Amino acid sequence: MPLPHTHSLVVSTLSLEHSDKPQRRSRAKVKKKKKTNMSWQTYVDDHLMCDVAGNRLTAAAILGQDGSVWAQSNNFPQVKPEEIQGIKDDFTTPGTLAPTGLFLGGNKYMVIQGEPNAVIRGKKGAGGVTIKKTTLALVFGIYDEPMTPGQCNMVVENLGEYLIESGL
Amino acid sequence: MYGGDEVSAIVVDLGSHTCKAGYAGEDAPKAVFPSVIGAVDGVEAMDVDVDSTKTNSNSEDSKTESEKEKSKRKLYVGSQAMSYRRDHMEVLSPIKDGIVSDWDLVDNIWEHAFKSCLMIDPTEHPMLLAEPPLNTQQQREKAAELMFEKYKVPALFMAKNPVLTSFATGRATSLVVDCGGGSTTISPVHDGYVLQKAVVSSPLGGEFLTDCLLKSLESKGIKIRPRYSFKRKEVRAGEFQVEDVDIPDTTESYKLFCQRMIVGDIKDSICRVPDTPYDDKSYSNIPTTSYELPDGQTLEIGADRFKVPDVMFNPSIVQTIPGMEKYAEMIPSVRGLPHMVMESINKCDVDIRRELYSSILLAGGTSSMQQLKERLEKDLIEESPHSARVKVLASGNTTERRFSVWIGGSILASLGSFQQMWFSKSEYEEHGASYIQRKCP
């Protein structure tokens, strides 16, 4: 698993701040921390499991696209290799999961509209899951009532966009 | 989080046939008008009808040639404007194949709804827009951009038509059968979301049936005369003779628009879905029903009462209607309503199919056709898996069935728990239009 490169993160952050793009792109704000404390777990704890308008994800994780666990919250389910493979297949060929459902640790989610090769969204009762694909990773957010699907999307996809912009 | 409790949101459902708009919280849209627009190219017409017109005269060098052409158009929006014939006025639709293809027309329709019908200032009202289930990301972003940049709305949400219909009946899960004017769409809704991959659509909607009836009547020598095209002359006390009025500068599209209005009313008045598949022999001797045309002609309509609506169930009937030859290539690939329903359900997860069969919701103006519900239920019971418990549900109230999308939007936008879901103006300014994908999944 790649280590978060402090140097490249700082450079990326600086370049973003000086961007001339007319429309500012979303990015997660990275708190300044000592080098020794920078870790993938920090991304999960501070940027995924954070408070959003009084609501919080029930579980979150950043996994490598090979299924390796970079970081996860305490109650993130134990995913199986075939579940990860199913997710990757659906990114490659959207629609493969819809007839069978999306499984995470044995929990079944109905697939709703996502974004081809970028986002998969699932629904289970009033809650659901959002999975954002980045260059090297998969960012997971699992939510339940009263958190809204839009709020989960914001947290997961904002972090995912940031990772993509950082080349990760 | 946008605090949307203060003022009523505006709900807009722009369909391919009609646009519905009104205040959230009310039980029916305040404005209902045609989704088509009259357009006169390139001339400065000396029209006194100022209230219903809008001139897009601001040309810019950066616009493409077609945009320059569009900017010279004089556009006429709304029932009243469309009821008045004008020389060289073409009738245009902003929607092609279910997707917006002309945003300038959409813009004018929205403006008509806000300014002329509802008489509101859009900067003061959050907007809930209903959208088709297969709407593209680009279309959503374009709509968001137009709403925030031009109308400067304080907040926006976009919800899919079948989700709103399902919501209007208090269901989180259902199979929505939306028989609209321009198309028929089957959409499974699960826990408040469309199961995208299982959406099935067909171009056979109410307007197609109207065209079938129009061609069938014309093939029998019946002339459908729009009001502008004839005058009645009293030849004897109490006796009138109809004379055609020659108005050569009327466009074919406007003539067709007017004929469709007349034939659409005939269809709505007398058509009835047959209990079993239509065949010519069984219906050759049935009693006729009378209908008086605007020119005083009385029609006697027999088999067509049952033949035309059966097109929804057996599209191949179209081949037997003179004048519908141009659809010969398209028809073989179109399936009837019961098959579309089963096709959609079979694309869904096995675990929810049973629930979908027992919650089939009818929606859209064409679904109000007499006996359509009963026929669909009967056909599905016969053809669906034995384990399925088929139940076709439809509001007994035709207004609710016709406007179910709008009504669902009205309910949704009024909910306290919905208020945290708005895509606010400040979020748009910070993140841009693409944020709509996250805020309104």
UniProtKB/Swiss-Prot annotation, chain A:
Record's family?
A: Belongs to the profilin family.
Summarizing the function annotation, the protein's role is: Binds to actin monomers and regulates the organization of the actin cytoskeleton. Can increase the critical concentration (Cc) of actin assembly in vitro. Acts as a downstream effector of the hydrogen sulfide signaling to regulate the assembly and depolymerization of F-actin. At high concentrations, profilin prevents the polymerization of actin, whereas it enhances it at low concentrations. Binding to the poly-proline motif of formin induces oligomerization of PRF3.
A cellular component term (GO) from this record?
cytoskeleton
Q: What else is known?
A: Plants overexpressing PRF3 exhibit a dwarf phenotype with delayed seed germination, reduced lengths of roots and hypocotyls, and inhibition of hypocotyl cell elongation due to F-actin rearrangement.
Q: Where is this region: Disordered?
A: 14-36
The superkingdom listed in its UniProt entry is Eukaryota
Protein name per its UniProtKB record: Profilin-3
* Pfam families reported for this sequence: Profilin
**Which UniProt keywords are listed?**
Actin-binding, Cytoplasm, Cytoskeleton, Plant defense
> What subcellular locations does the record give?
Cytoplasm, Cytoskeleton
- Kindly indicate whether the keyword Zinc belongs to this entry: no
Q: Which InterPro entries match?
A: PFN, PFN_euk, PFN_sf
| Induction description | Induced by hydrogen sulfide. Down-regulated by treatment with the flagellin peptide flg22 elicitor.
Q: Where is the composition biased (Basic residues)?
A: 24-36
Answer whether the UniProt record assigns the keyword Cytoplasm to this protein. yes
**What phenotype is described for loss of this gene?**
Slight elongation of leaf petioles. Increased length of primary roots in seedlings.
Swiss-Prot record, chain B:
Tell me the GO BP annotations in alphabetical order.
Answer: chromatin organization; long-day photoperiodism, flowering; pollen sperm cell differentiation
Induction remark: Before cytokinesis.
Q: What does this protein do?
A: Involved in several developmental processes including organization of plant organs, flowering time, anther development, flower senescence and fertility, probably by regulating the chromatin structure.
- Protein's UniProt name: Actin-related protein 4
Encoded by which gene?
Answer: ARP4
Compositional bias annotation for Basic and acidic residues = 60-70
Q: Subunit structure, per the record?
A: Component of the SWR1 chromatin-remodeling complex and of the NuA4 histone acetyltransferase complex. Interacts with the SWI/SNF complex. Interacts with EAF1A and EAF1B.
Q: What is the lineage of its organism?
A: Eukaryota, Viridiplantae, Streptophyta, Embryophyta, Tracheophyta
Q: Could you tell me which SMART domains the record lists for this protein? A: ACTIN (SM00268)
